[in-house]
From Swiss-Prot:
DNA-binding residues (ranges): 126-224
Location (main, coarse): cytoplasm
Encoding gene (name): graR
Single biological process term from Gene Ontology: regulation of DNA-templated transcription
Cytoplasm in keyword set: yes
Protein name as it appears in the record: Response regulator protein GraR
Source organism (scientific name): Staphylococcus aureus (strain Mu50 / ATCC 700699)
Assembly description: Interacts with GraX.
């Protein structure tokens, strides 16, 4: 597994790099924090670990840049205790968030869970689903409606796939959380809310935001 670790604290970087390499992860770091995207594009990571507080530009800036060109999973690290940092990271398309200090074994468990979730279908052939008058491409994380195409994050696509495969049925929040993360204890309820909100915002670009309905106190439903 190729990990790009964007961390300016060299002591922490070296400690994490050593721990991750013991699990056979190939870890790259950043030499010039003004050129993070250069390393990102040349290294082609399978997962990015991104610190919030960085020199020159913060992690949110680099997350936006990465999302312009890739759906690679991004896990944020932050020493700040502001809950809005977590909300912002989810809104920008991050897949997970950890606050410093943290247990390294928890980080490794999260990385392994993300990897399984995102890459378990990479060897499969193209898979598509028809939803209303749109075509959902599960292999490309995209939705095409007429001449318009939108792209989802891996997390958003998993949520949508669950809802579409149970069209016109209420899917509980717990069911979705269980499918997204291996250990529910590591997930806040707000994280799912943010991801669904972001999914609806993208669907609005192709006039499909009303296709997913919130059932208060129960969960969500995708209309056929």
């Amino acid at each position: 597994m190729q990990i790009l670790l964007v961390e300016d604290d060299n002591t922490l970087f070296q400690e994490l790099k050593k721990e991750l390499e013991q699990w056979d992860f190939n870890v790259a770091g950043i030499e010039d924090f003004g050129k993070v995207m250069d390393t990102f594009e040349s290294f082609n990571p399978e997962i990015v670990i991104l610190d919030v507080q960085l020199p020159k530009y913060d992690g949110f800036y680099w997350c936006r840049k990465m999302r312009e060109v890739s759906n690679v999973p991004i896990l944020f690290l932050s020493s700040r205790d502001n809950p809005m940092d977590q909300v912002m990271s989810m809104e920008l398309g991050a897949d997970d968030y950890m606050q410093k200090p943290f247990y390294t074994n928890v980080l490794i468990a999260k990385l392994q869970a993300i990897y399984r979730r995102v890459y378990e279908f990479t060897a499969e052939e193209k898979r598509t689903l028809t939803w209303q008058d749109a075509v959902v491409d599960l292999s490309k994380d995209s939705i095409q409606k007429g001449d318009d195409t939108i792209f989802l994050s891996k997390t958003e696509m998993i949520i949508l796939e669950i809802l579409i495969t149970k069209k016109n049925q209420i899917v509980s929040r717990d069911t979705i959380i269980t499918a997204l993360w291996d250990d529910e204890a590591f997930v806040s309820d707000n994280t799912l809310t943010v991801n669904v909100s972001r999914l609806r915002k993208k669907l609005s670009e192709i006039s499909m935001d009303s296709a997913i309905e919130t059932k208060v106190g129960k969960g969500y439903m995708a209309h056929e």
